[in-house]
A protein has these predicted regions:
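Short helix-capping/hinge SLiMs at alpha-helix to coil transitions
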Residues: 17-21
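Short alpha-helical "packing" element that flanks the helix-turn-helix/winged-helix DNA-binding module
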Residues: 10-16
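Amphipathic alpha-helical dimerization/coiled-coil segments
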Residues: 76-120
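Short, cationic-aromatic polyanion-contact patches
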Residues: 3-10, 25, 58-80
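Basic amphipathic alpha-helical segments that dock to polyanions
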Residues: 13, 40-50
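Short acidic, hydrophobic short linear motifs in intrinsically disordered regions
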Residues: 22-32
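Glycine-centered, phosphate/nucleic-acid-interacting loop/turn motifs that mediate DNA/RNA or nucleotide
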Residues: 51-52, 57
Length: 120
């Protein structure tokens, strides 16, 4: 799998797939976006060929058998490929500097400590 640079349509479809724990058909995806069903099917084929999604099973869409799709790449993995480490460091630094809620900062501190413990 190469580093993804999704088009607007690919990203829109991936966000729909990331937004649910269920496997989705092209018809269900088309109900959640203004993209035409034919375009959705073409984009799904492209994402499938690139191995960013997989056909998880065959199910019914009404009375018709259809492929059901599930993402292979997580949204977190995608975001980490899009945002460089230097950009991420500046983003986090600015985010923390803007925080006025000490409870939220404590929560972030706990997340960081848990990751450090995991790495030790």
């Amino acid at each position: 799998m190469d580093e993804p640079i999704f088009t607007k349509r690919e990203l829109a479809i991936m966000q729909i797939l990331w937004g649910t724990n269920e496997e989705l058909s092209a018809r269900v995806i088309s109900e959640q976006t203004k993209i035409s069903k034919n375009t959705i099917q073409a984009v799904l084929r492209k994402l499938l060929e690139a191995k960013y999604i997989k056909t998880s099973s065959i199910g019914y869409s009404g009375t018709v058998l259809t492929r059901l799709y599930r993402p292979v790449m997580t949204e977190e993995a995608y975001l980490s490929t899009v945002v460089s480490k230097a950009t991420m460091e500046r983003l986090i630094s600015n985010f923390v500097a803007q925080q006025e809620n000490s409870e939220y900062l404590d929560h972030l501190d706990n997340l960081i400590q848990a990751k450090k413990d995991e790495l030790s």
